[in-house]
Every structure is written in C-alpha cells, then in structure tokens.
Amino acid sequence: MANKEMFEDTVEERVINEEYKIWKKNTPFLYDLVMTHALEWPSLTVQWLPDVTRPEGKDYALHWLVLGTHTSDEQNHLVVARVQIPNDDAQFDASHYDSEKGEFGGFGSVSGKIETEIKINHEGEVNRARYMPQNPCIIATKTPSADVLVFDYTKHPSKPDPSGDCSPDLRLRGHQKEGYGLSWNSNLSGHLLSASDDHTVCLWDISAGPKEGKVVDAKAIFTGHSAVVEDVAWHLLHESLFGSVADDQKLMIWDTRSNTTSKPSHSVDAHTAEVNCLSFNPYSEFILATGSADKTVALWDLRNLKLKLHSFESHKDEIFQVHWSPHNETILASSGTDRRLNVWDLSKIGEEQSAEDAEDGPPELLFIHGGHTAKISDFSWNPNEPWVICSVSEDNIMQIWQMAENIYNDEEPDIPASELEAQGS
C-alpha cells in the first residue's frame, strides 16, 4: 500500500515539475511581470499595505507587504517586507526573461528587490495577518492559540528581540480555539471580527482600549454556526453588516444592530461541502462570493440569497481564498489546494465559445496562474498597481505577478485596410 502511495506521489511530483517547466517557458507571453522569491519560511498569509512610494528618477516604485512565518520549531515572526516593482515604462520584453531565476520584466535579479524591513516576534505561526484600514501600522494576527494579537509595528524595533519574547500591543480574548478568518471594519475604526474553530465569531472594538493590562475582551460573540467557522468579512459599505462561512456548509449574514447574537439575519446552504472563504464586492453593495471545498466559487446577491447567481467551476480541489479585484467590479480571483490561482470575469459569463476554448474552461475563466508547485496559502491584489497580485505557497515561494495586458484588454488589434482586403478576397 505504502509503495503504491509512494509511486503515486512520485508520478504527481513529475507531473507538477513538467507543468511548471511548460509554465516557465510560456511566462514571457502570459505575463507583463513575474517575480519569484523564496522566503526563509513559508508564509500562510500575505497582504499588500496601502502605501506606495515612487522615488524620483527611478524606474520602479516601492510597495510593502505584510507576511508571517510558519517555521518548524524555530521562532516565528510577523514580517513587513519592501518590494521594488518596475514602472510600466521599464523595459518589458521576452528577451529579458531570466529562465534560471524565473523572473521577467526588464529587471535583472530579484535579489535586492524584496527586502525584509521589520520582523516582530510572534507566538507560534502567523495563521493570518491583516492591517487596520484607518491606520495601516496596526496589524492583527491569528495565532495557534485562541488569542488574537494586535501589533503597532511603529512601536517595535525592526530587528526582533533575540530572547524571542512576543509582546503584542493588545491581546484580544474571546475564542476557545485557533482559526483563520479576520476582518477589520473599513467604516468603523477599530472594529475587528475573527472566526474560529470553536464555531464562533468574535467582535472587538479596540478603539475603547484595554480595561487592564493589554487584554481586550470581545464586545460580542456570534454563535450561529454549528461547526468550524472558516472565514468572516465585514460588508464594505454597511458598517453593521458582516458575513461568515463555516464547515456547516452555510453562509450567514449578520447585523450587529440586531438584539440577538445567536441567530443571523440570513442563513443559506451555500455549498455541498465546507465553505472556506468569502469576499464582498467593493463596487456593488449586494454582490458577494464564497469559495468551498466543493471546488466551486459561488456568486450571491444579498437581495435574494435563496438563488445562487452563478457557480464558477474549474478548480480541481478545495478553494481556500477568494478576493474581488480592488480596481474592476467584475473581476475576482480564487486559489487553493490545486496550486492554481484563477482569475474570473463576471462580464464574460454566458459568452459563446469554440469547442477548443471550452476545453480550457468556461468563458468567465480569464486567466490561470500556474506558477506555484505547492498549495497556495494566501494571495492579495495590489491596491496601487492594477492586475498585480502577490501569492504565497506552502513551499516558501512568493510570487508577484501581472498577467499580460492583452489578456484583460479585449480590444481587437487594428488591422490595416490593405490586409483586410486580402483576408476578404
């Protein structure tokens, strides 16, 4: 039995390597930018910070990322890294692709382009880290314990204390177990939601400050789910609405103004397996998406949750992340266990396809990022550079990439009249 499994693993490894080689060969045609960076330890979390600096006279801009570590037994850290991304006018052409380093974009080597700026000691691995929109120096993290930690990174030295002591600025209490889901309210400063394996969602208001020491108790605990709560997200336009998804296969919509914390405003059987993630559309107040272990992303309208608007089908395994693009109302992306990050375009749903195109996936599947050879742990859309995504996988790899413009810009190239006549004759 073990031999059969070993054989299957070897075959899978071979297939993965073969697919990666093909992907690498095709990057110059599929991407305007690819930066591949091996982190010292895998990160389970990634998020672009909102700041960008454009140094005068340079052909790049500086961006920052929030990362974490997942070490074997060594000290873990919350990490802020600085990234140089070339400007659009920097040289991009296929001859600049460095097949050894897996980089592309007129841009020598990645070494020196991605630098760790701040490392803060952390208790156990960082399951997820998210900055507070009203003050991006404040970062909340999920730990392997039940506590949610809050760090103001301006109050910590950039090099961690060698003792390994973790001293968060706040410790948020309320959960009994660890989890992953974490969401700051973009309309109410300091309001933080967290999802947990203990079947609950906790809400804190950190603007009130701790009663004593550094501990803040939950303001409310929502107990509607009957299984592990995988993810939670505030609505982006209504300060009192949020959604949660869980292993009970349900999507729940909650209103913090309600006088009950045990019953959501709406509950939907969203998928045929665990629901792992959700994302509200930043442009359309009624639209949200959920991703599931049933390998699909579902599209929902808050005005009629009884009816699933659409099911996006192409992933070969569980979906753990789904995020709408910050720049385009109809674009969302999803990723997970199948090592693929899929970018979808709602506006293409129902478009006619040739049989050949249909083999690659439905018309709304705009792009498949195939650069990872291990499960994708998290990804983030860059808020300042449209179509730039950073994705991290379990094998320590971080990729910063942008699909080729001709993929998302549908305009047909102008064909000179002389050629048109030749075609028509």
From Swiss-Prot:
Xref: Gene3D superfamilies: YVTN repeat-like/Quinoprotein amine dehydrogenase
One of the GO biological process terms: chromatin organization
Pfam hit, one: CAF1C_H4-bd
Record key words, sorted: Chaperone, Chromatin regulator, DNA replication, Nucleus, Repeat, Repressor, Transcription, Transcription regulation, WD repeat
Major location category of this protein: nucleus
Family: Belongs to the WD repeat RBAP46/RBAP48/MSI1 family.
Purpose: Core histone-binding subunit that may target chromatin remodeling factors, histone acetyltransferases and histone deacetylases to their histone substrates in a manner that is regulated by nucleosomal DNA. Component of several complexes which regulate chromatin metabolism.
Name this protein carries in UniProt: Histone-binding protein RBBP7
Gene from which the chain derives: rbbp7
